[in-house]
Curated annotation (Swiss-Prot):
Descriptive protein name: 3-O-alpha-D-glucosyl-L-rhamnose phosphorylase
Major site of localization recorded for this protein: cytoplasm
Catalytic activity, reaction form: 3-O-alpha-D-glucosyl-L-rhamnose + phosphate = beta-D-glucose 1-phosphate + L-rhamnopyranose
pH-activity note: Optimum pH is 6.5.
Organism of provenance: Lachnoclostridium phytofermentans (strain ATCC 700394 / DSM 18823 / ISDg)
Length: 756
């Protein structure tokens, strides 16, 4: 079990083979461009080792052998004809293992499963984004050596990864050999995918050039510079190849106090549009030192992370857990380009294939929109770069405009697993992207982005919905869809889908009237009549709402049983189902649908009853998706149920630390972890940003002394502080902003304090 120290460290105190796969995910180091799992330097075990570059993907064989053991799986979940045809899938590709560092002490190579471990500690320093390990090891002959390892993915130079490893003899004078290099024998999905072009081996450096696979053939180059030291003096080294290992080695005599290797790795691909790809061999001549690179990295990381860091006062454990969650949320974001976007596992594992889902715009984008908008902008430009393929998707469906795939990768066509029925019905993804664009603009007023990218996407998204809806009983309806709750496919008028579509249509018309230019309209030929059609559909789209104020998740939802009939052996548990349930007969849902409207989307729904809906749907949700927990935390805060808020917040920050869903080894739950930040911002502090004001509704939380965070609203950086029943906003920017609190408007310039 991992522990917390000094509000910044996540620490492992013993070597445990059982938790090694899970902790490899948790100890990932990354910088948005690359992610490197926390595997051991001396040996990268299969399914534990993993190094990834954002957008470095190709095709793999994916073996899957599910079977249907109840009516629900047979008729509603699997398409068994397509299951027979499925064998290939796009996936992120595991790079060569460049972490390889081994120490030979006398005749014994250090491995933690050999000899005796006298002490062991691995720690992730979230304040510096550095991963460290310290081991005291006794070999079979009783020789004791202390090993210290340190590594980080540079925030100063995103293509650089730095490592340092040291051996310190304690009771012997044995010679020490350090072996540092690259292990090319790696697998993705259990198979060898990389296509090697060439390798170069020098006395103090290595270069490996390979391609992602046979479909895309993305070329990657990795250069490694090794410098070996004995008591601070540079040592001679040689280069050699041993089967799959590309190595630099230095054999040093006994009697030294400290033996060290400093290892600098540069990674680049031909998709990066970076001159490093053509000049990578020159990095072996680099005279930069590990300490200099470390100092520059810490400086850049500290500045970057300070935008996101929330301080919880009076609860050090929760403060550390939140900082860990925020760390993983933000290392998924690329600050420099839009080659790829925010994926569900970030760059911490192979599972979910580095695909981009609706999680991106709804769960992951808010932390960046409010704290570092440039990353959010890159994520949305990623969507724009796939607009043409989204147009083709709409045509294939017989619709106009653009339909975005439920799952995307390098391409904008659908990449979801073909044997599952529901993803092809989850058309809400197209509205989710529209919502993300609008949310970004509300908080940034980035007119240039809208002119170059945003409006064109919004117009095409609206065109899709206008052609998608069906006129029935005097209203426009959306039939045969799946909402966010994947347990219920083939439903009519899903609440989440209809409400978010209506919002995107309505807001697009509003933004068009206030901000759009004829240049964008002319580019895609949007006409006045089309704008009228968009307005009409937004006005007449059916929005589910009962007279009681309850919102049915879809047509006929309340007619289903509130119990879940169980039938079968439970093969569905591998597909995020807690039981072998006949979900099509039950109101039991996988994750929030209706409650997203009130929490993440912040819709003010006339005549609805928020608390009654929350009371109902909380009980119907089996929480088999991690995305449940931050939503439920916010809803609990809105209902002034602060103990419930704390419990759901605990599940949000601990989803992977405590391995709540028993799959942390596959990679962290980036959407849920991003929700930890948003649960404080939106839930506890009650901050909702509108285009013309900030609304606040802070909550008294008796378990903590206070909370502090910073956010950006329309270029104004604001510090928010919650201390008991006093809430304060402060800013050095003199721009005036309207703030609404308890029905009263305040003019906020540099400081605003309210009591509640």
């Amino acid at each position: 079990m991992l522990i917390h120290e000094d509000n910044r460290y996540i620490v492992e105190k013993e070597y445990n083979l059982v938790t090694e796969p899970q902790n490899a995910s948790l100890f990932t180091t990354g910088n948005g461009y690359m992610g490197v799992r926390g595997s051991l330097e001396e040996f990268g075990s299969t399914r534990i080792q993993g190094s990834f570059i954002r957008g470095f993907v190709d095709e793999i064989i994916e073996v899957i052998e599910p079977f249907c053991d109840n009516e629900y799986m047979k008729k509603y979940y699997f398409d068994e004809e397509k299951l027979k045809k499925f064998d290939k899938q796009i996936s992120c590709i595991n790079l060569v293992d460049f972490l390889l560092i081994r120490f030979r002490i006398g005749d014994e190579i250090f491995y933690p499963w050999e000899g005796e471990i006298l002490s062991w500690e691995r720690r992730l320093d979230t304040s510096q984004s550095i991963f460290q390990r310290s081991v005291t090891w006794k070999d079979k002959m009783g020789n004791i050596t202390v090993f210290e390892f340190e590594r980080f993915a540079s925030y100063d130079e995103e293509h650089r990864y730095c490592m340092r490893a040291m051996a310190k003899p304690q009771n012997h004078f044995l010679p020490v050999e350090i072996i540092s290099g690259i292990d090319t024998d790696v697998r993705t999905g259990g198979q060898r995918v990389l296509q090697f072009i060439n390798n170069q081996i020098l006395n103090n450096g290595l270069i490996s050039c390979f391609q992602s696979g046979k479909r895309y053939g993305i070329t990657c180059k990795i250069a490694v510079k090794n410098s070996f030291f004995m008591d601070g003096k540079l040592q001679h080294s040689i280069g050699e190849q041993q089967e799959n290992l590309l190595l630099n080695k230095a054999l040093m005599p006994g009697g030294g106090r400290e033996y060290c290797v400093e290892k600098t790795i540069y990674l680049t691909t031909d998709r990066d549009c970076d001159p490093l790809f053509d000049t990578i061999d020159t990095v072996l001549l680099d005279v930069g030192t590990y300490d200099a690179y470390k100092e520059a990295h810490i400086r850049e990381w500290s500045q970057f992370f300070s935008n996101f860091d929330i301080k919880i006062l009076g609860d050090d454990r929760k403060d550390a857990q939140l900082r860990f969650a925020t760390y993983h949320a933000v290392i998924t974001g690329d600050r420099n380009n839009s080659i790829h976007s925010l994926s569900a596992k970030g760059l911490t594992g192979e599972r979910y294939n580095q695909f981009v889902w609706w999680d991106c715009e709804i769960y992951q984008l808010p932390i960046f929109i409010h704290a570092f908008p440039e990353v959010a902008k890159h994520a949305l430009i990623y969507r724009y770069d796939r607009l043409e393929e989204a147009r083709e998707n709409a045509k294939l469906e017989g619709c106009k405009g653009a339909r975005y795939p439920f799952v995307s990768s390098l391409e904008g066509k659908e990449h979801v697993w073909i044997y599952a029925r529901h993803p092809f019905l989850q058309v809400h993804i197209t509205a989710d992207i529209g919502f993300g664009i609008i949310n970004y603009f509300i908080n940034t007023l980035d007119y240039e982005f809208m002119e170059l990218y945003g409006f064109e996407m919004l117009y095409e998204i609206c065109r899709y919905w206008v052609s998608k809806v069906i006129l029935k009983d005097g209203t426009y309806q959306l039939l045969g869809v799946t909402g966010t709750d994947e347990h219920h496919p083939y439903v009519d008028n899903d609440a989440y889908t209809n409400y978010i579509v209506q919002y995107v249509l309505q807001e697009t018309i509003l933004l068009d009237s206030q901000y759009s230019s004829t240049k964008v309209r002319d580019k895609i030929g949007i006409t006045v009549n089309e704008l009228k059609d968009i307005e009409q559909v937004s006005r007449l789209l059916y929005l589910p709402l009962e007279k009681s104020g309850l919102i049915p998740q879809f047509d006929g939802y309340f007619d289903l049983s509130r119990d879940l009939e169980v039938d079968g052996s439970g093969t569905g548990k591998n597909f995020q189902m807690k039981q072998a349930g006949l979900y099509h007969k039950s109101q039991v849902i996988k994750q929030p649908d209706v409650m997203l409207l009130f929490s993440y989307l912040n819709f003010e729904i006339k005549n609805s009853r928020y608390e009654e809906n929350w009371d109902y749907y909380e009980k119907m949700c089996e929480s088999s998706s991690s995305l449940t927990f931050p939503v439920h935390a916010i809803c609990s805060a809105d209902a002034n149920r602060m103990l419930s808020f704390l419990n759901y917040f605990n599940e949000t920050v601990n989803i992977d630390l405590l391995d709540i869903h028993h799959c942390a080894w596959q990679g962290v739950h980036a959407g849920c972890l991003s929700g930890a930040w948003y649960a404080i911002f939106r839930g506890l502090m009650g901050i909702v940003t509108r285009i013309d004001c900030i609304q606040i509704n802070p909550k008294l939380i008796p378990f903590w002394q206070g909370v502090e965070l910073s956010f950006i609203y329309q270029t104004k950086k604001i510090k928010a502080t919650l201390n008991g029943n006093v809430f304060t906003l402060g800013s050095e920017d003199k721009k005036e902003i309207s703030v609404y609190f308890q029905g009263k408007r305040y003019a906020f310039v540099d400081r605003l304090e309210v009591s509640f």
